[in-house]
Regions:
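Bacterial N-terminal signal peptides that target proteins for export
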Residues: 1-9
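C-terminal motif of bacterial Sec signal peptides marking the signal peptidase cleavage site
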Residues: 15-18
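Beta-strand-enriched cores of mature, soluble protein domains
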Residues: 23-28, 32-183
Length: 183
């Protein structure tokens, strides 16, 4: 009992210290630091916190012919996140100008080529100037490649974008479920 309590305390200290750093993570989370199984996790999967930051640039939107309220958008970003380390994001989506809702698909690819694949639903909200918006996107993990094969879970990307300047940056927070023995 004492050994189990000591091991649990050590894991808690390691997680608190790791999550308390002021900058973004610099390497993927080690599976050795993960010891608990979530009751919300599918079929014996392990829930792993997923946090990070990204920044990138959007391509100019492609508007559909009137009277359609839709345009297509493409974003390429890079960042740093737990599990992935340094990554690139490739995100294509379609936005309704009437509702400011966007739907699309994204791939977050780690430096070694392993990727998390997601379906994305987002909502833009005006943020000051007529061209500035805060975008909140829910990424639902639909699978992956390499070590992320069979992954599930979801995370939220909250980012700022100004269409007068295609630069965007933001944060990532959620949980990824790893099939037993993965990550």
């Amino acid at each position: 009992m004492h050994a189990r309590l000591a091991a649990s305390s050590l894991v808690l200290v390691v997680l608190c210290v790791g999550c308390g750093q002021s900058g973004p993570p610099t390497s993927p989370t080690s599976s050795a630091a993960i010891t608990s199984t979530s009751s919300d996790a599918p079929g014996g999967s392990i829930a792993i916190p997923f946090k990070g930051r990204l920044e990138g640039e959007a391509d100019p939107p492609v508007f559909e012919p009137p009277p359609s309220p839709f345009f297509s958008a493409h974003l390429v970003a890079s960042g740093n996140a737990t599990l992935l380390g340094r990554f690139t994001l490739d995100f294509s989506h379609r936005v309704n100008l009437n509702t400011l809702v966007g739907i699309g698909d994204a791939a977050l690819t780690a430096a070694n080529g392993d990727a998390l694949l997601t379906h994305v639903e987002g909502q833009a909200m005006p943020a000051g100037s007529p061209t500035a918006f805060t975008v909140v996107e829910t990424h639902t993990v639909t699978g992956g490649t390499g070590r992320f094969e069979g992954a599930s879970g979801s995370f939220v990307v909250t980012r700022a974008v100004d269409f007068a300047n295609p630069f965007t940056s933001g944060s990532i927070e959620g949980s990824i479920f790893a099939p037993s023995g993965k990550f």
